[in-house]
Amino acid sequence: MAINKSSLQSRINNLSKKTGVHQNILLRSFFFDAFLKRLSISKYASNFVFKGGFLLSTILGINFRATNDIDFLLKNTALEEENIISIMKEIASLNVGDNVDLSYKDFQEIREEDEYGGYKIIFEGRLENIKETISIDIATGDPITPSDVDYKYKCLLENQILDFKAYNFETIIAEKLQTILARGILNSRLKDYYDLYIIHKLRWNEINSEILKRAFINTCEYRNTIYNKEEAFQILESVMTDNKMNSFWTNYKNKNKFVGDVKFKETTDVIKLVLDIIFKN
């Protein structure tokens, strides 16, 4: 559906007042939707599996979790620079009648935070004279236990539903927990702590404990990091008492309004509960 600048600004202003989410975050989400609409009608739709913060934002609500990029697991397609750029440009060029232009800007290898690699593709979204930069992160390889799930994505500013594949909750939790344990006090990804906390608070009744156990084992084996219960709790204890980690949490909370007044100890207490479930005989 086509939209003009005035209508977009009005809708974003109204939604910002309703949700308390900053207008810049909502504008970015609008351009994310522009990409997703194009992806959904492309021949590559089944090759992209939703994961990461954007998936959580759409499931939990943007007022509980905002993000700066969209994360995908790529399957049945080569994760090679030339191939990925070609695919992404083709997707962005599709016409969905929304009055939005997506221009390819850059391609970067991801190494800073993801030791397992991947690529970041950057587009500039434009509607009339409104511009916003969006990032699409793509990785491959990690196992999904038992498999990806059908996911119906609802666009932010309209009632359009897009069909995709997505991670299940158990695999999301398993990957975040593995990252927390693997990085210990060297972890600057405080979003993993918050994500486990908010999933536990809002959607834990949907978690299958046996699938979660298998997902954690599969993720750890794939990433060559095997933990027993004692090791896992020792790592978590060192994190809980580390001044730098507590300082990181304060900074993360101050930068992300959706975190509210959640304390770092509340997140680590939740992680203890999750570890108890995983290591329960």
Model regions: which residues?
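Structured mid-to-C-terminal alpha-helical surface segments
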Residues: 1-48, 58-66, 70-281
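Catalytic metal-binding/acid-base residues of hydrolase active sites
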Residues: 55
